[in-house]
Amino acid sequence: MSAELASRGRKVYFVGLNEYPFLPLVAGLLRTYAEQDERIAAAYDFQEPVFLVAPVQEMADGIVEPDVLALSCYVWNFRRQMKVAKLVKERYPNVLVVAGGPHVPDRPGNFFEKHPYVDVLAHGEGEVAFRELLATRLSDHPDYTAVPGVSVRRGTEAVVGPKAKRLPRLIDTPSPYLLGVMDGAVATCRERGLRFYALWETNRGCPYSCSFCDWGSATMSTLRKFEDERLQDEIEWFARHDVEDLFICDANFGIMPRDLEIAHALAEARGELGAPRQVRVNFAKNSNDRVFDISKTWHDADLLMGTTLSMQSTDMDVLEAIDRKNIGLDNYRKLQQRYAAENIHTYTELILGLPMETARSFRDGIGSLLEAGNHEDLRVYELGILPNAPLNTPEKIEQYGLRTVPKRMYVERPGTPDDEAETFEMVMETNAMPRDAWVESFSFIQAVQFLHNGCYTRYLSIFLRQEHGIGYTRFYEGLQDYFTGRPDTVLGALYLRMRSLYHDYIDMPALPLANLVASQPDMAADLAPYGRRRGWTIDNWGWLRIATDFDRFHTELREYLATLGLDPAGDARLEDVLRFQQDVMLRPDYSPELGKSAEYAHDWPGYFAGGLLRPRRVRVAYGDQSFGANGRYRPVPGDLKAFTMAAIGTSYPVSRMGHFCHRFESAEVTSLAEPVVSEQW
């Protein structure tokens, strides 16, 4: 089958928008499955998918004489796509508008009353329903209500069709990659100089039923897999088409025994043909030996962007409320140690605002994860209410006191109408976490991200925990309390600005979810020397603000230690670790050619790698040549933009792997007999 097919009359358009360039896999899957029907292949002319965001009117104008308009709807594209459908329907009233995807409600309710330009909703898996819709449309008097898995508009009411049909346990659908259907999208991205992700499925389904997520309910839980031969051929396609970035869309990669074989095949393609260069994946929720082996395989092949050790919350009452089972903190600690022994980067994702979560349990959870050894990457997201999530019922919302705000997703272009601005219902208050507690909790974790994950206080806090018994929660709560009362300090100004911003964030729905920093002129001005981005995050801003006032920050940090009963002037070890903590940070003047060294009274790299703390005069020499996942970013002395890429990487995809500070594995530690001094090469 060729992607360049002769015109056959009935035009089919797909729209599936994303702020980031993801290849339109859904459109390809729907098309190739439908075209197995010879009648459909003969009657319809499938157009190139609309997947790159443009002004709504421009996208609508590009849809010319459509017979069918298919929309793949997610929370990040729903409003714009509805507006495209409305404009197209006004111009071409006979077009059949079909909306599918996770944002289409399982229970139509008043959907068609709100969106009368949509004709059909496709629920769940779309291939079978879409093919039957196209086949039905070819009849003289099409009756779409007979198609399984759809709801059909009749006036403003919904007529629900028969139960949906699903693909078999061994999915044998044609591959849009192998049939050339994706070639046009790849060419478009490359012509525009866009870094894109190739989306890829190896299996479908999720056996879990977390109440905040719609994945398990949407896929009806049963795991089904694509054919082995097809997957191997697609891996070769990715490699031969020099696809740099691959996103595996499975809900739980590593849950199936063959997933390790797939991982080896990708690593072999990377080694033999040079691509893919980077793999993003949703790892299996309950991490196991297979996930470790996959991570090790990709780490060794320089493919891995990090391994998820899932949590969402550490509180048992919260986990019960969201129907979630975790791996347990003891097992989590063992996994952290296992991955750390192989220098494999891990990260843990938490959700703020879950049912039953209090400010105390949230902060204690952060502390317990740091105690368990996750010092590099804690990620926290606000709880959003998805249309088809089990949590999204009137009973659950009332039970837990979930109060939401319809947040804008992005900083929209000037003049963007409200009906084109994407929104997401975000939980900003619950019975267990009032608004002020939500604000303070979010400020707390953001500071932990740029101070601890970002390395400014990581080694100091580990030292204080191990040698002085000062727990991580106490240390970071103390920081917040002390500096919030001192607005004239670097951290004090950051804490108070975050508090003010998050109160505004709740009160002002137009303040965006994804581009919050870019919406604030003062924050954008702070970051201007480091480059222009729409995707700056709060922890990016905090980290770079400290980089700007680096020496002042360290002076003020010493003042805070006095509140803990600590005096560096009278504690040689504390003074030594403070110097090490300052020296280990990546700075704008660092030269890969010259390197950097300093001398200490203790072997701090050895200590923080798990050794004993003994007096030992050492020289620590760093020779890092590049930073970030896969070593993509090389710093240039005095070049703030190059420094920023090396220090924090890109805003998307997010990865804290190999950023912020010098790495022990690149350091040379030499024993000395001479007096201890510091120097820079």
Swiss-Prot record:
A Pfam family this chain is assigned to: B12-binding
Cofactor: [4Fe-4S] cluster; cob(II)alamin
Pathway stated in the Swiss-Prot or TrEMBL entry: Antibiotic biosynthesis
Consequence recorded when altering residue 76 to A/F/H: Slight increase in methylation steps
Effect of residue 383 to F: Reduces the rate constants for all three methyl transfers
Superkingdom, taxonomy of origin: Bacteria
Record EC number: 2.1.1.-
Keywords tagged on the record: 4Fe-4S, Antibiotic biosynthesis, Cobalamin, Cobalt, Iron, Iron-sulfur, Metal-binding, Methyltransferase, S-adenosyl-L-methionine, Transferase
Signal sequence bounds: none
SMART domains recorded: Elp3 (SM00729)
Stretches assigned to the Radical SAM core domain: 192-417
Residues engaged in binding cob(II)alamin: 18, 72, 74-75, 103, 126-127, 214, 249
Biological processes annotated in GO: antibiotic biosynthetic process; methylation
Chain residues that bind [4Fe-4S] cluster: 206, 210, 213
Family stated for the protein in its record: Belongs to the methyltransferase superfamily.
Matches recorded under PANTHER family: ANAEROBIC MAGNESIUM-PROTOPORPHYRIN IX MONOMETHYL ESTER CYCLASE-RELATED, SLR0320 PROTEIN
Protein name: Cobalamin-dependent radical SAM methyltransferase TokK
Species this chain originates from: Streptomyces tokunonensis
